[in-house]
Design a protein with these regions (language model features):
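Extracellular attachment/recognition segments
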Residues: 1-76
């Protein structure tokens, strides 16, 4: 099963991606393509469940920043 999202805006906090159709297991792969990152920006994924996952973008100082991203999730 593959699920994806395009041009999502994270906001400055934690963004929750919710799948339309849950996976059977939380052992799926997630690929992220971030747009408009500044030097030193990074993201972290967390709370992967069968229903979705969380993502947060931060700048080099560790403060939350709003960024646009695409994702692709593949699993069972």
């Amino acid at each position: 099963k593959i699920q994806s999202g395009n041009d999502l805006t994270s906001g400055t906090g934690t963004y929750t991606v919710t799948f339309t159709n849950p996976f059977y297991s939380d052992n799926y792969a997630v690929g992220i393509s971030a747009q408009g990152l500044a030097t030193g920006d990074y993201y972290s994924l967390g709370s992967k469940t069968i229903n979705g996952f969380n993502i947060a973008f931060k700048n080099s100082g560790g403060s939350g920043v709003s960024r646009t991203f695409d994702y692709l999730a593949k699993g069972y």
